[in-house]
Amino acid sequence: MRAPAISLSVAALALAAACSSNPSPQSSPNPRQDGRTRGGADTMPGNRVIENSRPDVSARAGVLVVANQEGASATVLDAATMKTIATVPVGVGPHEVAVSHDGRWAVVTNYGDRTTQGNTLSVIDLAAAAPAVTRTIDLGEYHRPHGVAFVGIGDKLAVTSETSQRLVIVDFASGRIDTALATNGRGSHMVASRRDGRRAWTANISDGTVTEYDLDTRRTGRTYPAAPMDEGLAVSPGGVQVWVGSNSAHTVTVLDAAKGTPIDTLTGFGMPYRIGISRSGTLAIVNDPVKNRIWMYEVGSRKQLAEIDLAKVDGVKATTGGAPGEAGAGPEGVTFDPIANVAYVTLHGTNQVVAVDLQQRKVIGFGSVGAGPDGVAFSPYVR
């Protein structure tokens, strides 16, 4: 058992000083006094990490935040028990979620629906006794926010704006727009970043391309062809590989990030709708709502490790609907708890989120959420 430790970098001190000049209860990156994050939380510069002293760090803990696309809400769950902590009203059509590196804050993109174009982000305080939206970030002219990631040293957000064809960089503490980078592609939907937050990529659905960004210099880099109707997107932690799912070709294209060229193509999917790569960079999950399956791959070799057929999993509810073309549960969003070696997957068709043991390669837990769950994010914050 490791003793509790605090790591506070020079960059964090600079960030704290900047925040103190414009004080706001929402701008502090630190957990509440009695809160803590577990060992293994992201220790990128600028983040205070308080290690939990629990002897068994492999046990599930922390919280999950699920965007309920059809419920205008986000469900906050205890990751250990899969019980609901709070159902938080957000904007119309919430699609994706990102959690700050210290685990305290969740940011939900309010995309809108068929009649309303959203342009806001909801910020949820996960450390509050009753998690709730503490502020709303207005993106102004940048409508249809979808993909979102904490980047830089954790002090910035990268958000796709589909209608504007921009990757919008937002200062998290102030909520002000830092810059908006051209995506050079239509339908820029998902965004994924390298673990150090210095480079990012977007999948541009309508053009079947991927665009890269240098977040240090705030410049748009290359745009290169990937696959038609590419939506699912994941980047290995070191930024070596970019995995791109094609909804129409039913394939996953693996790109060499340095060259922007394909190194492999995985086949046999109905719709590789969402892709996630573990923090270790060794395992990839591909969620396929058409074939109702969760696929697992070794990243280095691209070898298939497992295929979980949700129709055969006890505990998955009877289908309540789902998007057109979906069969059964409809697995969509994915996130990882790197300490417990567990992934969490939303089931759009059954209004559930499931825990998947990455060693046993099977579903080990279930939680009920709101209507039409889509994006999901894990926080190591221990309540």
Segments (PLM) and residue ranges:
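Predominantly soluble domains enriched in secretory-pathway, periplasmic, or organellar proteins
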Residues: 19-383
